[in-house]
Amino acid sequence: MTPKIVCVAGPTACGKTTLGVLLARRFHGEVVSADSMQIYRGMTVGTAAPTEAEMQGVPHHMIAVAEPSEQWSAAEYVAKATPIVDDILSRGKLPILVGGTGLWMDALIRGHGFAGGHAGGEVRRELETRFDRDGIEPLLAELWQVDPESAARLHPADTKRILRALEVYLETGETISAHNAATRQLPPRYDAVWIGLQFADRADMKALIDRRVDKMAEEGLLEEVQALLAMGLPRNATAMQAIGYKEFLGVLDGTLTEQEALELVKLRSRQYAKRQLTWLRRNPAIHWIYWEKDRDFARALQISTEILTASGLG
């Protein structure tokens, strides 16, 4: 029988962390984070990583497990998180996946579907050298020759996925589109019960995101960016491109005032939340809970408990 896990998903600032903890306490679970930025050490403020108090004694996994200089893909996340989920299950506990990185959540549930090739290996370095020298156009033209399906799907600005598609083909002889099509037919590794959180009124979500960004500034986001630079983290590191960090680099460079940076972080956070919702709404398995003016966690816990109990958990 496919083991069951719970997924708590939603856009930034919607209360996933709190509901995940409440469900873990109710169902004897442990939280596994699925946030592509909370994996990094030294970035607790800008990623809104849960504090010890917010964890309420519930074990949390996959938070602050990587150096900010590292670059993780969904494949690396799955490789690290799967043994943790399996260990939680082996101890009779319920894994509760919490996060806003929908691709990583889907990938962990599938448990397969990653094309071969050694991401970051010699082939990737050669492709990156060519990209730095010649730009993306010749590489995209090459992708059209070997994998037209991927080339047609990818925007020229999506250089990361263009390089990855070429890397897979050059290392394995198989196109990434063919590989993905084949693996979509395979059964998932886990049977996921999805709980989704979002606001009924987008204006309420906007207000909450704005308050969260202000709180990050008060808690020392600028100082966190300075600390990362002081430890030698390059400005072009993936971690530094996260919302909040990139903008506050501008403050340190003198190209933005702190207030301008804050407004830009708020705008980009709202845009990111919209993209998160677009991704998640494609998933028909999600049981959505809609917040009204405020986030009523007692009500959300009650609804979630009913959903999980009906799914055979509890």
What kind of region is each of these model predictions?
Residues M1-G314:
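Phosphate/pyrophosphate-binding catalytic cores of soluble transferases and nucleic-acid-acting enzymes
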